[in-house]
Amino acid sequence: MPREIITCQVGQCGNQIGMEFWKQLCMEHGINPEGILEDFAVNGEDRKDVFFYQADDEHYVPRAVLIDLEPRVINGIQKSAYSSLYNPENIYIAKHGGGAGNNWGRGYTDAEKVQDEILEMIDREADGSDSLEGFVLTHSIAGGTGSGFGSYLLERLNDHYPKKLIQTYSVFPIENDVVVQPYNCLLSIKRLTLNADCVVVLDNNALTSIAVDRLKILQPTFSQINSIVSTVMAASTTTLRYPGYMNNDMVGLIASLVPTPRCHFLMTGYTPLSLDQKFTSVRKTTVLDVMRRLLQTKNIMVTGAVKKGAYMSILNVIQGDVDPTQVHKSLQRIRERKLANFIPWGPASIQVALSKKSPYIDSGHKVSGLMLANHTGIRSIFKVLYDQYRTFRKRDAYMNIFKQTKIFEDNLDEFDSSDEVVKSLIDEYAAAEKMDYINWGSDDDDMQFDPREPPKFSNIQ
């Protein structure tokens, strides 16, 4: 029985990458833009029901809720070839249509006002599932809607569905993308730390560099960057949709990657990468070649994160016609060459999940791979944003913008709380590099989490 996943797309960025994700899933499952299964895909062995359900006329509908405070992106989706794919009852656009003005406080406050309407959509989707496993949130943490509305939604999902998993695909910003983004990011990272079970970090700087350096695109567009993101998202869910013996549900994936509750921020790598699946610069793909490339810094989608620190866990999702003995030999070669540095207190091994490729897409290569990795160096991206926040906060820069919203009109306690959580997260990732990490925080009575506490998902396996 498939374990269903509901996708919540929040804000401009969240809906843009969500749209690309659904396009990719439709292609991989042989579903046309109107949700109708193509004749050639009728006898497929895939699990479409994880992300889609069938309407009364048997066309496929994404288990998705689309949310934005301004109409432009969702209106574009509704005017596209995929306009009839989505359930129109699951689309929310704010009546005022003015957006959140890149203000986390406005996004959060607006979400609080309409929470009943949003939760009704989500509850309806949940009630239509036979065995709901969890939720996926797509959003950016830099602007107002994805960060503020997304933060509020994370809190409510955690309260409303305490035993369901929450995974996010969170886009981290390019420098100076939004003037108040250090505030928005800090407030969002607190919620991602406390209310999500797994966060896939999508670093816009790294994605842009990959598009320029690897794909040779001089000035990448948002659409091209989002296409890279959708490739990663689709690959990270492939074992759920084309199940094998292992990692065929979300809980299995997350449990293999997240050893302690708060250290659940993942980085990704993908190879071979091409915006046109029929053309790629990699002439020959073997399991060893793919697995070696996944460990190269230039292929990792978080800037500079693996230059220092150590891996806590690695899961490689290998797609294609693969001989398991080649996987074993490749792992042995990587171990001999010490291509991956692991933390001293855990298993120093790369986990591998083998998955089928969609038979409906001619990818032009035999083997492809996605790396999902938990690495202590991820703290570098938090440290940059945290330092920017501290610089702003010392000067009280732009703080009047936030004081105009309900959550900050009386005090700034929420900033202080977020500061504490993010600083602790940075410290914990640094501590995880040392052998005595299992005792980390044991003398601190105020710690909200004990690193030895089992993650939420371990209770529902």
From Swiss-Prot:
Entry protein name: Tubulin gamma-2 chain
GO-annotated biological processes: cytoplasmic microtubule organization; microtubule nucleation
CDD domains named among the record's database cross-references: gamma_tubulin (cd02188)
Organism: Euplotoides octocarinatus (Freshwater ciliate)
Cell compartments where the protein resides: Cytoplasm, Cytoskeleton, Microtubule organizing center, Centrosome
GO MF, one example: GTP binding
Highest rank taxon of the organism: Eukaryota
Record's function text: Tubulin is the major constituent of microtubules. The gamma chain is found at microtubule organizing centers (MTOC) such as the spindle poles or the centrosome, suggesting that it is involved in the minus-end nucleation of microtubule assembly.
Residue positions binding GTP: 142-148
Principal location listed in the UniProt entry: cytoplasm
Pfam families in alphabetical order: Tubulin, Tubulin_C
Lineage: Eukaryota, Sar, Alveolata, Ciliophora, Intramacronucleata
PANTHER family: TUBULIN (PTHR11588)
Cellular-component GO terms for this entry: centrosome; cytoplasm; gamma-tubulin complex; microtubule
Keywords attached to this entry: Cytoplasm, Cytoskeleton, GTP-binding, Microtubule, Nucleotide-binding
Family membership noted in the UniProt record: Belongs to the tubulin family.
